Amino acid sequence: MSEPDAYVKSLVTEIVPFIEKNYRAIPKKSSRAIAGLSMGGGHTTRATILYPDVFDYICPLSCGIQDSPQLDEQLQGIKKAGYKLYWVGCGTDDFAWPGTEVLDKALERNGMEHTIYASDGGHVWFNRRLYLNTFARLLFK
């Protein structure tokens, strides 16, 4: 049986250090972004909830979350740690759209500045290219 959140833990404790050791990356929160689409968007939200001191730029794409009693507390951890960008993209016909609305309401409820980029269409590559082209221009400003 695997450990819950093992992938997210590996991403933060193994992959980020590997990149910063082997590439010309600046090893600090203000120089790190995380983005993912679909399940990767779920990993993005989970990584920032579990490790709020690691990434300043948070961009989950085409993913939804479920509301839970712990969600506000988890988002408050991100708010307390600080972040520079919380940008969420999802198509209004995407099956993940209802979960994106949950995230939007939770971020609003917790007083967290964020952008919800609602595009036409569903869970399709065209939208992901649009999101990447849009949010990438906002990184590291």
Task: Outline where the language-model segments fall.
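Non-catalytic cap/lid and distal C-terminal segments of serine-dependent acyl enzymes
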Residues: M1-K141
